[in-house]
């Protein structure tokens, strides 16, 4: 395996404050040679300068946009610069553990998979709690309608317990926190669907791969950890609020439903979930409100005052 055989594309998931920690971890924990393409969409000055310095020092290709980019748009920009047999997409808030890349590549080589996902962990301390080990994602036709069936496998388990139970296997679902794809696959499928601004992009790709006859595998020998918010730095907030804005969420929902001809208005509750997820930006304020009003009073205030104001303000600022 030589460097040009693997391109790693890093993009911002929802914030920038983890960029330095994640990039340093990537280099420290990755032994296999790779080409790095880093797509920086509108990061704050401190992060921008750090990435410019690191790009010169380490020799990776930095694509800089002055404006914020939707993650799918950023991945497509990175994909235009990818070379070699495999491309790995990874978010800028993900930590990796030694051997992760070798395990993903080995799985692709031995199975012929079009997509390979690692065992995904989340939260801090890192590599203790499981986010998912693959899952299901398919369209079910029933009662004259088309419905999305989606579920994570083994979410919330302790890593040491889950890892002892799982092994490499075919799956229907991997996520863009980190995944390996065959570069040649995009010659057949085309680029990632840029109409999916904030949600459904991982499901869309998995559905498209399986519809085209490709296979998807989960490789638990590869470990990554998504560092979830909160906290969010003040400099993270503008992008975070756009990334999960009602405008982007609704556009993604409409596009995904239309593309896959779905009957349900909110497939698997995704719109409801991402709308609530955006409110993580309010967590410091919510904590103070609950300290002042108690759990019951604070919850009432959130539902009847804070959340409606946040939603109206988000729609006003990001039409």
Report each predicted region and the residues it spans:
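Short aromatic/hydrophobic "clamp" motif used to bind/position activated sugar donors
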Residues: 87
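A recurrent flexible, glycine/aromatic-enriched loop bordering the glycosyltransferase active site
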Residues: 72-73, 144-181
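A conserved acidic beta->alpha catalytic loop
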Residues: 25, 38-49
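A short, conserved alpha-helix in the catalytic core of glycosyltransferases
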Residues: 172-190, 195-223
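Short, acidic, metal-binding catalytic loop of nucleotide-sugar glycosyltransferases
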Residues: 24-33
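Active-site-adjacent helix/loop segment of glycosyltransferases
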Residues: 121-124, 129-130, 134, 207, ...
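Glycine-rich, basic loop-to-helix element that forms the pyrophosphate-binding segment
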Residues: 65-82
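Conserved donor NDP-sugar-binding/catalytic core segment of glycosyltransferases
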Residues: 99-146
């Amino acid at each position: 395996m030589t460097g040009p055989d693997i391109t790693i594309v890093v993009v911002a998931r929802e914030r920038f404050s983890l960029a330095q920690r994640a990039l340093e971890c990537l280099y420290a924990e990755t032994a296999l040679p790779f080409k790095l393409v880093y797509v920086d969409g509108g990061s704050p000055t401190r992060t921008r300068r750090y990435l410019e310095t690191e790009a010169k020092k380490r020799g990776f290709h930095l694509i800089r946009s002055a404006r914020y980019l939707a993650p799918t748009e950023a991945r497509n920009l990175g994909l235009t610069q990818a070379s070699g047999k495999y491309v790995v997409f990874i978010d800028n808030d993900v930590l990796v553990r030694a051997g992760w890349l070798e395990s993903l590549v080995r799985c692709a080589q031995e199975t012929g998979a079009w997509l390979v996902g690692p065992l995904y962990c989340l939260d801090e301390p890192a590599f203790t709690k499981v986010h998912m080990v693959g899952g299901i994602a398919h369209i079910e036709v029933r009662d004259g309608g088309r419905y999305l069936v989606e579920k994570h496998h083994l979410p919330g388990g302790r890593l040491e317990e889950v890892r002892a139970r799982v092994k490499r296997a075919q799956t229907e679902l991997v996520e863009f926190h980190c995944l390996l794809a065959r570069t040649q696959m995009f010659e057949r499928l085309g680029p990632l669907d840029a109409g999916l601004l904030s949600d459904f992009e991982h499901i869309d790709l998995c559905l498209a791969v399986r519809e085209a006859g490709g296979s998807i595998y989960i490789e638990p020998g590869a470990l990554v950890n998504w560092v979830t918010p909160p906290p969010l730095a003040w400099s993270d907030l503008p992008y975070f609020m756009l990334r999960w804005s009602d405008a982007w969420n609704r556009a993604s929902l409409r596009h995904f439903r239309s593309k896959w001809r779905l009957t349900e208005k909110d497939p698997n509750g995704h719109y409801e979930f991402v709308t609530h997820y955006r409110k993580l930006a309010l967590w410091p304020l919510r904590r103070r409100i609950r300290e002042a009003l108690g759990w019951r009073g604070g919850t009432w205030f959130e539902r009847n005052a804070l959340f409606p104001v946040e939603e109206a303000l988000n729609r006003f600022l990001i039409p």
